[in-house]
């Protein structure tokens, strides 16, 4: 056996005998380091004749490659063994009770939960979320939504007005999220499918009204939108939101400045118990308003009403939260009572999804 064969056998045996990566590294340095045994052999190539390089030189290179491959393979084996040993030492007793984390002790406010639920429903229908400022101009809050001069909503007793600016213009705390509809029409070409959740403000306060409350509106603009589309969208929403197999709805003629025709929508329910049950019973409850977007509103949004049409709807988030989860007093939403939040709040990690259950 030649000296190269002997060195090959010796090094491969040393590599196979290593039990950890430091020992393997020591073998590598002894063989392939600057003063390693294989490196010393490589230094002799310059003094060889051409014939010797073809035989002995090739054998030395083959030795180097064999040792390099063996080291790489052994390193992979040792790494896997180290991982397995660590995993074995880190075994967890899954029968132990889970300690409550700070995130688990906290609660999501019902309004935030309702917004997430509604977003999940309409996102599945292809809607996106639009937002706008809480402080609005008279133009976007009233004029662009077809409110005539002298309309009661423009009066001080119903709307929060700011003091006039240097130009005499008074801004308002928006009384609805509808201004975002006009802003979206100005900024985005049809087709448009949006929902608009947000805070709104009116001078009203009792068990079912608050000076600051939450609304969500929806808007669809295209060339073929019609009342049948409104009915389908709202029926599908109500079935999914109230988590029932079917709902019976009725549309009553109404009036809103920004829609024509306009409807109030009632849903059939059972109000005999402390919690309203939807999808059953013989009672009726109004839940939202809707209608076809008024041609004047389309014009204010920069759209031609002879080419485009649309429908819109709006509802109070606080009210439908009270209906769905049996909350008796709207004012409790804003009292920051930890006991109330513990009872009515939702766990932070239980995000509502259509496949997992909205209120699971």
Curated annotation (Swiss-Prot):
The protein's Enzyme Commission number: 6.1.1.20
InterPro entries in alphabetical order: aa-tRNA-synth_II (IPR006195), aa-tRNA-synth_II/BPL/LPL (IPR045864), Phe-tRNA-synth_IIc_asu (IPR004529), Phe-tRNA_ligase_II_N (IPR004188), Phe_tRNA_ligase_alpha1_bac (IPR022911), Phenylalanyl-tRNA_Synthase (IPR002319), tRNA-bd_arm (IPR010978)
Xref: PROSITE patterns: AA_TRNA_LIGASE_II
Location within or outside the cell: Cytoplasm
CDD domains referenced in this protein's UniProt entry, alphabetically: PheRS_alpha_core
Catalytic activity: tRNA(Phe) + L-phenylalanine + ATP = L-phenylalanyl-tRNA(Phe) + AMP + diphosphate + H(+)
Keyword ATP-binding on entry: yes
Cofactor binding: number and manner: Binds 2 magnesium ions per tetramer.
Cofactor requirement: Mg(2+)
Record's keyword terms, sorted: Aminoacyl-tRNA synthetase, ATP-binding, Cytoplasm, Ligase, Magnesium, Metal-binding, Nucleotide-binding, Protein biosynthesis
GO MF annotations, alphabetized: ATP binding; magnesium ion binding; phenylalanine-tRNA ligase activity; tRNA binding
Subunit composition and interactions: Tetramer of two alpha and two beta subunits.
Family of the protein in this entry: Belongs to the class-II aminoacyl-tRNA synthetase family. Phe-tRNA synthetase alpha subunit type 1 subfamily.
Name of protein: Phenylalanine--tRNA ligase alpha subunit
Organism: Rhizobium etli (strain CIAT 652)
The gene coding this protein: pheS
């Amino acid at each position: 056996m030649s000296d190269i064969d002997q060195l090959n056998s010796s090094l491969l045996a040393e590599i196979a005998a290593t039990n950890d990566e430091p020992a393997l590294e020591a073998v590598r340095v002894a063989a392939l380091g600057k003063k390693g045994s294989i490196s010393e052999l490589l230094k002799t190539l310059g003094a060889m004749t051409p014939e010797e390089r073809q035989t002995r030189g090739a054998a030395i290179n083959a030795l180097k490659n064999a040792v390099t491959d063996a080291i790489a393979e052994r390193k992979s084996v040792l790494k896997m063994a180290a991982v397995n040993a660590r995993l074995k030492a880190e075994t967890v007793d899954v029968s132990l009770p889970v300690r409550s984390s700070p995130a688990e002790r906290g609660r999501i406010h019902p309004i935030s939960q309702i917004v997430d639920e509604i977003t999940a429903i309409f996102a599945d229908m292809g809607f996106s979320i639009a937002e706008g400022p809480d402080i609005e101009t008279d133009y976007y809050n009233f004029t662009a939504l077809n409110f005539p001069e002298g309309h009661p909503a423009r009066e001080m007793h119903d709307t929060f007005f700011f003091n006039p600016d240097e130009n005499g213009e008074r801004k308002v705390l928006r009384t609805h999220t509808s201004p975002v509809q006009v802003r979206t029409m100005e900024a985005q070409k049809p087709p448009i499918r949006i929902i608009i959740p947000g805070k709104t403000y009116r001078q009203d306060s009792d068990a079912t009204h608050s000076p600051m409350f939450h609304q969500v509106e929806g808007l669809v603009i295209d060339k073929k939108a019609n009342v049948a589309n409104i009915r389908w969208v709202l029926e599908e929403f109500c079935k999914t939101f109230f988590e029932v197999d079917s709902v019976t709805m009725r549309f009553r003629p109404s009036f809103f400045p920004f829609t024509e025709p306009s409807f109030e929508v009632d849903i059939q329910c059972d109000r005999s118990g402390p919690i309203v049950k939807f999808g059953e019973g013989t009672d009726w409850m109004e839940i939202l308003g809707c209608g076809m977007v008024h041609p004047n509103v389309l014009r204010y949004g920069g759209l031609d009403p002879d080419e485009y049409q649309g429908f819109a709807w709006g509802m109070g988030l606080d009210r439908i939260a009270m209906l769905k989860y049996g909350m008796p007093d709207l004012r409790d939403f804003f009292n920051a009572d930890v006991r109330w939040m513990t009872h009515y709040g939702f766990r932070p990690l239980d995000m509502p999804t259509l496949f997992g259950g909205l209120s699971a």
